[in-house]
Structures are given as C-alpha cells and as structure tokens.
Amino acid sequence: MATAMAEDTSFEGDQLASMTTDDIGRASRLLANEIRILKEESQRTNLDLESVKEKIKENQEKIKLNKQLPYLVGNIVEILEMSPEDDAEEDGANIDLDSQRKGKCVVLKTSTRQTIFLPVVGLVDPDTLKPGDLVGVNKDSYLILDTLPSEYDSRVKAMEVDEKPTEDYNDIGGLEKQIQELVEAIVLPMTHKEQFEKLGIRPPKGVLLYGPPGTGKTLMARACAAQTNATFLKLAGPQLVQMFIGDGAKLVRDAFLLAKEKSPCIIFIDEIDAIGTKRFDSEVSGDREVQRTMLELLNQLDGFSSDDRIKVIAATNRADILDPALMRSGRLDRKIEFPHPTEEARGRILQIHSRKMNVNADVNFEELARSTDDFNGAQLKAVCVEAGMLALRRDATEVNHEDFNEGIIQVQAKKKASLNYYA
C-alpha cells in the first residue's frame, strides 16, 4: 500500500511546475501522511520483533531449566501415528487438545518401571526415534530431552581393541597359502567389495582357523586386523561361559550389536571350542547354558539380523569336537588348517624371530631348521629367546650358532614327549 501511495504522490518536474499552490500543499500533506503511516508501521514491527525476541529468550530459559541434569533414563517402547478425532464439537464445548493433535506419539518405559504415553514427544524429532532407543527424559513432565548412546555390556566394550595391531604378514613364516585364503575371505570383501558384486557372489561370513597350539592362528588374526581399517573385537570362548542363565547369550548379542554399529568390523573368537562343542543330552544346567550361548552365536551368524559387513574369525585347537551346525556352509564357510611348519618354514620362522637380534654371520638357519623337527612356531620363538639368554649369560655381543643349538636342546628338554596336542 505504501508503494502504491508513493507512485500516486510522485510528480515529474514539469508537472510540479504547472501545479498551483493549493495542489502543491495538498501533495505535501499526502506525503506527510504517508511518512506518518510508515513510521507507525515501523514502530509496530519493532514492537512485534521485541516481543518475539522476548518469547524466544523466555522459551530458551525454559528449555535450559528443563534440560538440567540429571535426566531420567527411558526406553522407547512404541511409536504411534496419531490422527485428530473427527467428532464434531458443539459450540462452547471444551476441546481436548491432545485428541486433536496430529503426528507421532511415543510410548515410553522409564527406569522407574513406569510406562508413559507422550502425545508431545519433546525436543527430539520423532522421525529419528525407533523402538528400543535409549532416551533422557524430564523427571517431572517425561518429555524426551535428548537421545542417549546405545547401552552395551561393559564386558563387551572392553573387548574392542583400541590400538591397531602392529603385526604384519611378513611376521608370519611358512603360511603363504593360509594368508592368501584369509585375505580372500576377510580382507578383500572389505577393501574391494565391488569385485564380488561384479561377479555376483557373496563372500564368506566367517573363517575357522584350526590346528595345533603355537602354529600362528592368533598371530594371523592380528595381522589380518592390521591390514584393514575395520574395528576389531576380540572375544575368548571361556569369556562367554557365564554363571547366570542367558548372560552368555546376551554377551554374544551385545558383541554383534556393537559390531553392527561400528561396522565394518572383525570379530575374533579365540578358543571357540569352549562354547561350540557338539550338543548332547545333559541334565546339568551348565551344559545347557553353554549350548544356549552357541545357539545365539548360530543365530547371529546367519539369522534374520545377520550383517555382511561383520566378519567372524574363530580359532580352535580341536575342530573335531565342534558342532556340525557351526561348521556348515553359510556360517563358518572357510576352514583354514594350520599344520606344524615344514623344514623350510621353520628356517623362515627362526629368521623372522632373530632379525632384530645381533646374530653372527656363521649361523646356519637351514641346519637349525633340520634340528627342530616337530617344533611349532611358538617353540621356535622360544629357541631364539633361549639363544639370546645364553649369549647374555657369557657377556657376548652377538649370538652364534652354538647358542642356537643349546637353545634347541633346552626347549626340547621342556617338551613333554607324551603330550599329544592335536588328535
């Protein structure tokens, strides 16, 4: 309206010269009236602006007051879609505002064991909520003030390896075939997923490493974790055997939930034979609880909630006692055997463990490898340590061939001849 008046009261120079004194006075009064109206509009707008600023400040103070810690912790039970009631209200009748609301409402269960229906969700967008979410609510109004991180068992959080392992495939001797199989099953699906999609195949979900003790199964898993940027969760089989019913299964479930949140993720289960033994009829409650823990593991491996971004590496010394359901395809698809090292592999392992030692040039690793028949990787490392200790005992500056020979004799003396590691 003010623009239209400006157009009406604008005069050209020639037109102004031809106007009489009365016309000019009338035009000036119109302009003065327009200026007065614009000033009144400006004052009214400024007052409205101040009022809105005051309301915003007041609401921010209320939010700040309501968001004071501590919160009451609650769980989202259900999210409902509300539509206003269509019943016609009579004139002058009281109107239930809650029944006229439109949008999402929430059923909430608090830590005080109360179940609350919230027609107004609170300060959190209801579209971002889902059943099972942990939220912080006001202890008086129960309005949702903030979302909280997912709750996991503290024992599961401790399983996450924060520091990246420093091992490399170069630290493993004589297991080139096993390294290739593990890389194909675990590393490539994470680093070159498009190659599998191009071929139209699904990579293995899990890998079972089995063989005698000391042959490098755990070392291989750590080297695999170091080659990927994936989160690494390390579980031990005996860790999952708990006293209370359902506790072990909850640990497995929480471990896979944490892995899904931090995906891509590698879960390494060492000594899986502690929970994965063949099922049998037993009246002992402890045996049944171990079997329930294994059933939860089977469900997580290929159940409805399985995730291809989670890879499982399991290691055991006794693959022969594992349950067939755990070994079938679709769960632990690839089985990689770790045998005792060959003569060539033993020489390579001795070189790896002695590469940082000050070794004399006359040390013949091929001869040492021939002298260490039936030694595993851990025992070959012990030979190198014993050789270094013998050199230290005689105040030598370097380790010679005789020290290694004496180290072999000492490690051999500690071996139990009747011990059968792997049946």
Curated annotation (Swiss-Prot):
Gene Ontology annotations of biological process type = embryo sac development; glucose mediated signaling pathway; pollen development; proteasomal protein catabolic process; regulation of transcription by RNA polymerase II
> Coiled coil: is it a keyword of this entry?
no
Q: Indicate the principal place this protein occupies in or around the cell.
A: cytoplasm
Which residues are reported to carry the modification Phosphoserine? 18
User: What InterPro entries would the database entry show?
Assistant: 26S_Proteasome_ATPase, AAA+_ATPase, AAA_lid_3, ATPase_AAA_core, ATPase_AAA_CS, NA-bd_OB-fold, P-loop_NTPase, Prot_ATP_ID_OB_2nd
* Keywords, comma-separated and alphabetical: ATP-binding, Cytoplasm, Isopeptide bond, Nucleotide-binding, Nucleus, Phosphoprotein, Proteasome, Ubl conjugation
Gene3D superfamilies recorded? 1.10.8.60, Nucleic acid-binding proteins, P-loop containing nucleotide triphosphate hydrolases
One term under GO cellular component: extracellular region
**Pfam families associated with the record:** AAA (PF00004), AAA_lid_3 (PF17862), Prot_ATP_ID_OB_C (PF16450)
A molecular function (GO) held by this record is: ATP binding
Instruction: List positions binding ATP.
Output: 211-218
The UniProt record lists the Glycyl lysine isopeptide (Lys-Gly) (interchain with G-Cter in ubiquitin) crosslink at: 234, 278, 415
The entry describes its oligomerization and partners as:
Component of the 19S regulatory particle (RP/PA700) base subcomplex of the 26S proteasome. The 26S proteasome is composed of a core protease (CP), known as the 20S proteasome, capped at one or both ends by the 19S regulatory particle (RP/PA700). The RP/PA700 complex is composed of at least 17 different subunits in two subcomplexes, the base and the lid, which form the portions proximal and distal to the 20S proteolytic core, respectively.
Q: Which family does it belong to?
A: Belongs to the AAA ATPase family.
What the protein does comes down to: The 26S proteasome is involved in the ATP-dependent degradation of ubiquitinated proteins. The regulatory (or ATPase) complex confers ATP dependency and substrate specificity to the 26S complex.
Could you tell me what this protein is called?
26S proteasome regulatory subunit 6A homolog B
